[in-house]
């Protein structure tokens, strides 16, 4: 065999491999795989991976295999932008994530400018979808919506209690706390103390002293499990019996690990329990086979992959993200593991739903 023939065969083989790689549909996952909220990133990672495995076993999307490419944002906006640029540089057109609002907002700008569609499973800040970006969707509700659920509960059941509102200064935490504050103020409750903590701090004694002086009986915390768990513990160590409330940032098992028995009774809002939805059966079985709990963030990430799949199939294109976005905006229902979803013009869920959950002896239970 001569050298020219060998070269021709080698070139043909290269083209063949390139075509095979190109045939795969790559979905990027931008999530905090390291850093203070890595526990949530891990849930999203596992949910997306499991959804892709199930989809590929069923023949993929339009006959093409789906692969994931992960980019770690560490829960930091600047690193999130770097992760987004990495995704863009790799020519990826679809993304699950980011996980936190503070990262999702700047990342959405980068992705929008470069024609990449994103479906966040967990970024709940209203600002994310309020800017009219055609490429942004989510499989979760917004902070203002979930804050109203908890505020309604407080107004109906704790109107005679002294309520304090605390946040972690972040886009998610402050947004959630401010939405809760506005809702209870509208309903006739004025908070006895409004304050903030700095992520990473360990000693909240000065804040606890202020809360104790104010006679706070209920403390709403907008933020994540690390600071929330420490605050819960230090409140009780100071002899306070204040009930801690919050959003889905307190839903991770690390909240209980940090707060210990002091976290007993903490109430938080989160998406309705998808495991009670018949549509979740296949997803739950797939997760159970891998010993993965069907937690809210995991299920939302699973559904985010399903949303991208539905959009690609409706658009009839595996690489035209604008066509896929248009297809998702058509108002038609999308069947997912967390139920039937439809999207508004902004990329928000048309009918989001939240429930209130409680920490009880280290387990999460629905509020009866």
UniProtKB/Swiss-Prot annotation:
Pfam family, one: Peripla_BP_6
Gene Ontology biological-process annotations: amino acid transport
Keywords: Amino-acid transport, Signal, Transport
Protein's name according to its UniProt entry: Leu/Ile/Val-binding protein homolog 3
Signal peptide: 1-23
Organism classification: Bacteria, Pseudomonadati, Pseudomonadota, Alphaproteobacteria, Hyphomicrobiales
Disulphide connectivity of cysteines: none
Role: Component of an amino-acid transport system.
Taxonomic source organism: Brucella suis biovar 1 (strain 1330)
Alphabetized SUPFAM superfamilies for the sequence: Periplasmic binding protein-like I
Similarity field: Belongs to the leucine-binding protein family.
InterPro entries: Leu-bd, Leu_Ile_Val-bd, Peripla_BP_I
């Amino acid at each position: 065999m001569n050298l020219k023939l060998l070269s021709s065969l080698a070139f043909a083989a290269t083209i063949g491999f390139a075509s095979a790689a190109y045939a795969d549909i790559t979905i990027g996952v931008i999530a905090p795989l390291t850093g203070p909220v890595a526990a949530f990133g891990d849930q999203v990672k596992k949910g997306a991976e499991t959804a892709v495995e199930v989809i590929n076993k069923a023949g993929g999307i339009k006959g093409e295999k789906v692969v994931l490419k992960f980019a770690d944002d560490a829960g930091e906006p600047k690193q999130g932008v770097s992760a987004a640029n990495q995704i863009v540089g790799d020519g990826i057109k679809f993304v699950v994530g980011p996980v936190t609002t503070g990262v999702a907002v700047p990342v959405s700008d980068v992705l929008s400018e470069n024609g990449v569609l994103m479906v966040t499973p967990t970024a709940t800040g209203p600002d994310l979808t309020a800017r009219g970006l055609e490429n942004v969707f989510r499989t979760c509700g917004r902070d203002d919506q979930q804050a109203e659920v908890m505020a309604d509960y407080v107004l109906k059941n704790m109107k005679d209690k002294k309520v304090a509102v605390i946040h972690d200064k972040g886009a998610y935490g402050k947004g959630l706390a401010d939405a809760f504050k506005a809702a209870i103020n509208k309903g006739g409750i004025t908070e006895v103390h409004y304050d903030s903590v700095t992520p990473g701090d360990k000693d909240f004694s000065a804040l606890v002293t202020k809360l104790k002086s104010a006679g706070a009986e209920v403390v709403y915390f907008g933020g994540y499990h690390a600071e929330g768990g420490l605050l819960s513990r230090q409140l009780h160590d100071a002899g306070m019996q204040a009930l801690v409330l919050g959003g889905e940032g307190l839903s991770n098992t690390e909240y209980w690990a940090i707060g210990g028995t002091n976290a007993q009774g903490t109430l938080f809002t989160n998406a309705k329990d998808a495991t009670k939805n018949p549509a979740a059966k296949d997803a739950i079985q797939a997760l159970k086979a891998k010993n993965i709990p069907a937690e809210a963030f995991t299920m939302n990430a699973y559904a985010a992959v399903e949303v991208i799949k539905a959009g690609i199939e409706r658009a009839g294109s595996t690489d035209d993200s604008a066509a896929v976005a248009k297809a998702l905006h058509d108002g038609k229902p999308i069947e997912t593991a967390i139920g039937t979803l439809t999207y508004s013009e902004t990329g928000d869920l048309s009918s989001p739903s939240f429930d209130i959950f409680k920490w009880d002896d280290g387990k999460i239970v629905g509020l009866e």
